[in-house]
Amino acid sequence: MKEKHKILYTINKYLLGGFFLAYYRPKFENKHLVPKDGPIILCGNHVHLFDQFLPILSTKRMLHYMAKKEYFDSPFAFFFKASGCIPVDRSIHDDNAKSSALEVLNEGYALGIYPEGTRNSLACKKDKLKEMYEFVNEEIPFKKFKKIMKKDMVKVSQTDLLLKLLAENKIIKDNIKNNIYRINEYLLELESANVITSNEYYDSLLLPLKYGAVSMAQKTGAIVVPYAITGKYRFSKNNLKVTFLKPFTVSSTDDLTEKNNELAKEIKDELLKYSK
């Protein structure tokens, strides 16, 4: 299979990528860990819409990202097709998307996957955003609240932990209300006070990983390359960074749960360095 849209992909990469680099001034660490040839699966955390730019700009290879089908039904459909993305219908078990991804790997190309299966962003989860807004709805308009949650890149995995603690009567509503704009810091305080364990805080850094990445690696012999994105998407903030982590393979005899846990651990270990 010949890689489609490679010329357009390259043009988009250098035009949009140049603007991205100038605007956000990101850092790239351990780019040498990304293999220059052969089938690979790049896997990382996903909070911001622009997350795929960082891995794409880290390698000369064309990176085929799996993206939700809705993007291909939008006015920007051509861009996603030209970027080599594979549409995924998340409302069903999408065998067509899986077959396309396996074909990419069997041809020796590079695939990008967000193993959490969705963006770990409160701002883009309508129902969960409204649930958290209930704690401050008398103080701030909904649109402004959403804007703050988006700017601060608040994670669903961390707000879910707070709601769990509330349900278990370990905290009260006022605790959430008073700390809703500093959720990560508040969770660290709860860890220090032994209200939550270190493992509970650690697990709040990511949503539970799906098995797609390690499963496809096992079927194709592809190398899994984990990465972690840290920092904020702010103009010239210069703390946005992608760090590539130790690659690994998944043999036919490996346990997928163990390998999926290995993938999650690599990413969370790196995120933990920047969360405290």
Q: Where is each model-derived feature located?
A:
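Short amphipathic alpha-helical segments and helix-helix/interface helices
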Residues: L16, P55, A77, A101, ...
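Glycine-rich helix-loop-beta junction characteristic of Rossmann-like nucleotide cofactor-binding loops
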Residues: K31-P35
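Structured helix-beta-strand junction loops
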Residues: A22, D37, A82-S83, E107-G108, ...
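A transmembrane-helix-recognition feature enriched in membrane-embedded lipid enzymes
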Residues: M1-N30, L54, R61, S74-S83
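Catalytic core of membrane glycerolipid acyltransferases/transacylases, capturing the structured
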Residues: K36-H93, S100, K128-V156, D160, ...
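Non-catalytic C-terminal accessory region of glycerolipid acyltransferases
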Residues: M1-I11, K98-K276
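Short, basic, glycine/proline-bearing loop/turn elements
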Residues: L15-L16, A82-D89, V195-Y201
